[in-house]
Amino acid sequence: MLNPIVRKFQYGQHTVTLETGMMARQATAAVMVSMDDTAVFVTVVGQKKAKPGQDFFPLTVNYQERTYAAGRIPGSFFRREGRPSEGETLIARLIDRPIRPLFPEGFVNEVQVIATVVSVNPQVNPDIVAMIGASAALSLSGIPFNGPIGAARVGYINDQYVLNPTQDELKESKLDLVVAGTEAAVLMVESEAELLSEDQMLGAVVFGHEQQQVVIQNINELVKEAGKPRWDWQPEPVNEALNARVAALAEARLSDAYRITDKQERYAQVDVIKSETIATLLAEDETLDENELGEILHAIEKNVVRSRVLAGEPRIDGREKDMIRGLDVRTGVLPRTHGSALFTRGETQALVTATLGTARDAQVLDELMGERTDTFLFHYNFPPYSVGETGMVGSPKRREIGHGRLAKRGVLAVMPDMDKFPYTVRVVSEITESNGSSSMASVCGASLALMDAGVPIKAAVAGIAMGLVKEGDNYVVLSDILGDEDHLGDMDFKVAGSRDGISALQMDIKIEGITKEIMQVALNQAKGARLHILGVMEQAINAPRGDISEFAPRIHTIKINPDKIKDVIGKGGSVIRALTEETGTTIEIEDDGTVKIAATDGEKAKHAIRRIEEITAEIEVGRVYNGKVTRIVDFGAFVAIGGGKEGLVHISQIADKRVEKVTDYLQMGQEVPVKVLEVDRQGRIRLSIKEATEQSQPAAAPEAPAAEQGE
């Protein structure tokens, strides 16, 4: 009854298996893709009819990791998977970005792609497997889709590109780049790098695109065997007469409106033109569809902007193709934060802060393969006021998570190692104004805020967004694109890096035919823009501050004998708890005996270090210590010395005369000098008050109270 169709092929060092026809047969298409024991089950369901009045393409991509895939039970209270993690959201975006441009213009039927990780090999990341699965399932489904696509991860180890490196190999790699594309063209790139050159990055993109052809070939073969008939879908016929009428009413006016350089003023004028045009046309013919008129007007807008750029005319805001908008760079703008910066580029502005914390502030991530600790956090917030709108304010949306991750990639390469700078660092970027490339403004602001906070980053980094307008063989690459140029252009190309090289590259390409030469021009133009921005940033702050903020915790590190860790922690954590309360510091102890004391007050930190040194000091036989009585028993008293170690003063060692009752001579909490007589093999300490007193003042042995002497 079940008759699966299977294809196997070698992909780099891994074997990939595509299997369909076995499971989820009520879905439009379903594929199980495995790559060396990492298996992802991908389904596609498409609605045969579009919803009435639908004016956008409702594509949803869900990526979900099941902990059973790694042989684990979820660590949450309910012991089941909950809302998507940040990692799952990012991979869902990674799948969505290269497939979305391949659906035909005008196709508005609902399509849902669900990728479920069902088995995982710790060495093989499921993201590439899920992307291959989505491509295969869409190609098999019969839904209008101009695929398939291939996907590849590229590493750079020992000056060599490596296809689909394992997790262990990635630790040695200077590059982690994911590239996806069709047989003819690259569609998406997502990467982080350790400051590689433009040529090295471009080489990785080309290498990945060449290597993924084997994936496309095998999906095509699978479609020949198991593909469903292609849907008989046709785009709505173009109403040439209506298009001409709308153009006659609006094209010249829109062309004039797009010469207004101020964004808000321009948007207001464009809205007036659109509403007046639609009102005029509806007055002429009430049967016209308002949504259709809106789409025609949008197409005219797009054509106006693109044709002007291709003709070499100034851009929307009057700039030439390679000009950067005006920059305003300020640091130390918030008095009590550990580091802050306000970075403004034209009508895009980011208020960025850096906060320093201890290892205890690190984020513990419960991932598929277990827990992982992240000591560098980057959060990006995009409130509705940044574009002059009202809207919901709440948990971050997919876009905010994606932009935050891109900005983090841009800064990661220059962050100091934990052994040199043992702080957890959190950067928050608040986008206060937006008109294009707010994620790259976040990179610039983060670099400034980190230097303002005294974080010893290896170099300043800046980011820039590039755009492309292409018709036939004629193309123009635009530097520092506006929001409108992003929407109306053919490519969104973001590059972050230092003067020495690229730290992050993200590309989203909406058309086929972007050649290596075009990408080379864009990368070189982006380098010039990046260096210009870095020059302006360096005028505001050219190196990390020599000291961290007075409001930031200072971490002091000392080393103790690992055998003494238990003494510092105490029974059930009693000693370390008392220490933190007594000194007002945060104390963390590692297994190798490294102790980190964090405090905003230097004197408190010194006090904590002194107390820890007392606790861990070796007790010297024959030495006199100041002690405190902690317990009184019939046969003597226990006295704490040397940072809390208890020793016994036997009743015979309290005074140089016979003592009947210990409480006649000693009270709880009393401070007394004691001499160490012996430390036995089990670490038990024998003390004497009598000998300590004799050693310091021969005639000053403790005496019974006067009232008792008279009896």
Curated annotation (Swiss-Prot):
EC class of the enzyme, as a word: transferase
Name this polypeptide is given: Polyribonucleotide nucleotidyltransferase
Family membership noted in the UniProt record: Belongs to the polyribonucleotide nucleotidyltransferase family.
Residues in KH domain copies: 553-612
S1 motif domain residues: 622-690
Presence of the UniProt keyword Glycoprotein in the record: no
Annotated disulfide bonds: none
Subunit structure: Component of the RNA degradosome, which is a multiprotein complex involved in RNA processing and mRNA degradation.
Segments traversing the membrane: none
Chain intervals with Low complexity compositional bias: 694-711
Coiled-coil zones: none
Predominant cellular place of this UniProt entry's protein: cytoplasm
Matching Pfam families: KH_1, PNPase, RNase_PH, RNase_PH_C, S1
Subcellular location: Cytoplasm
Gene Ontology molecular-function annotations: 3'-5'-RNA exonuclease activity; magnesium ion binding; polyribonucleotide nucleotidyltransferase activity; RNA binding
Gene: pnp
EC number per UniProt: 2.7.7.8
One cellular-component annotation, GO: cytosol
